[in-house]
UniProtKB/Swiss-Prot annotation:
<dbReference type="InterPro" id="IPR013520">
    <property type="entry name" value="Exonuclease_RNaseT/DNA_pol3"/>
</dbReference>
<keyword id="KW-0269">Exonuclease</keyword>
<feature type="domain" description="Exonuclease">
    <location>
        <begin position="19"/>
        <end position="182"/>
    </location>
</feature>
<dbReference type="GO" id="GO:0005737">
    <property type="term" value="C:cytoplasm"/>
</dbReference>
<dbReference type="InterPro" id="IPR036397">
    <property type="entry name" value="RNaseH_sf"/>
</dbReference>
<comment type="similarity">
    <text>Belongs to the oligoribonuclease family.</text>
</comment>
<keyword id="KW-0963">Cytoplasm</keyword>
<feature type="active site">
    <location>
        <position position="140"/>
    </location>
</feature>
<keyword id="KW-0378">Hydrolase</keyword>
<keyword id="KW-0540">Nuclease</keyword>
<dbReference type="InterPro" id="IPR022894">
    <property type="entry name" value="Oligoribonuclease"/>
</dbReference>
<dbReference type="InterPro" id="IPR012337">
    <property type="entry name" value="RNaseH-like_sf"/>
</dbReference>
<comment type="function">
    <text>3'-to-5' exoribonuclease specific for small oligoribonucleotides.</text>
</comment>
<protein>
    <recommendedName>
        <fullName>Oligoribonuclease</fullName>
        <ecNumber>3.1.15.-</ecNumber>
    </recommendedName>
</protein>
<dbReference type="Pfam" id="PF00929">
    <property type="entry name" value="RNase_T"/>
</dbReference>
<dbReference type="GO" id="GO:0006259">
    <property type="term" value="P:DNA metabolic process"/>
</dbReference>
<dbReference type="GO" id="GO:0000175">
    <property type="term" value="F:3'-5'-RNA exonuclease activity"/>
</dbReference>
Length: 192
C-alpha cells in the first residue's frame, strides 16, 4: 500500500505531473439510488512507468442495497467475492474518503491533477454524491481511457481488438487494467 512500508515499491515524489487512477465498483449505475461498494486508487508517474498502489476499500452497505442489485451486479460482485467483503466491512464512505485523501496528498497537490480511469465520469458522479471531498481534490479534467478505446474502434480497429481485458471487476484490478490499456493505446494508436 505505501512506498515506505514496502521497499519493493519505487519511490514516487509528490508532483503535479503524477496521475491518479481511480476505480469504483457500485451496486448499479444510478448514483441517486445505488451505492459505492469498492474503491481503489493508484498513483503513477507522468510516463506511467512507476505505480504506487493506494488503499483499497470494500465499503459496508446495508443488506437492502445488496439485495436490491440487478442480476448482473449480483452475479459479477458475487463471483468476485465483493458482496461478502462489503457485508463484512466496517468501513464507511466517510472513512474511505478520509484515508484516500491522506494517501493522495502524499503524491499530488490538491486541485491540479485529473481523475484517470475508464469511463471515469461514471465514477465521478458517485464521488460527487458519496465522497464529495475526494471528488473536489481532483482537477475538473479527466483522463478517460474509454475515449481512446472508442476512437481506436473507429479509426484503428486492430489497436482496439488487440487489447484484451480480463473483466475481473474488482477496483484495483480495473485500475491496473486501465493503466495497461492506456500504455497499449499510446503504442498502438497514438504512436507516442
Amino acid at each position: 500500500m505505501s512506498d515506505t512500508a514496502n521497499p519493493t515499491v519505487p519511490a514516487l515524489a509528490k508532483s503535479d505531473q503524477n496521475l491518479v487512477w481511480l476505480d469504483c465498483e457500485m451496486s448499479g449505475l444510478n448514483p441517486e439510488t445505488e451505492r459505492l461498494l469498492e474503491i481503489a486508487v493508484v498513483v503513477t508517474s507522468a510516463d506511467l512507468t512507476l505505480r504506487v498502489e493506494g488503499p483499497v476499500f470494500a465499503i459496508h452497505q446495508a443488506d437492502a442495497v445488496l439485495d436490491g442489485m440487478d442480476a448482473w451486479n449480483k452475479g459479477t460482485h458475487g463471483r468476485s467475492g465483493l458482496i461478502d467483503k462489503v457485508r463484512a466491512s466496517t468501513v464507511t464512505e466517510a472513512d474511505a474518503e478520509r484515508e484516500l485523501l491522506a494517501f493522495l496528498s502524499r503524491y499530488v497537490p490538491k486541485g491540479v491533477v485529473p481523475m484517470c480511469g475508464n469511463s471515469i465520469g461514471q465514477d465521478r458522479r458517485f464521488l460527487v454524491k458519496y465522497m464529495p471531498k475526494l471528488e473536489a481534490f481532483f482537477h475538473y479534467r479527466n483522463v478517460d481511457v474509454s475515449t481512446l478505446k472508442e476512437l481506436a474502434k473507429r479509426w484503428k480497429p486492430e489497436a482496439y481488438s488487440s487489447f484484451k481485458k480480463a473483466q475481473r471487476h474488482t477496483a484495483l484490478a480495473d485500475v491496473h487494467e486501465s493503466i495497461d490499456e492506456l500504455l497499449h493505446y499510446r503504442t498502438h494508436l497514438l504512436a507516442v
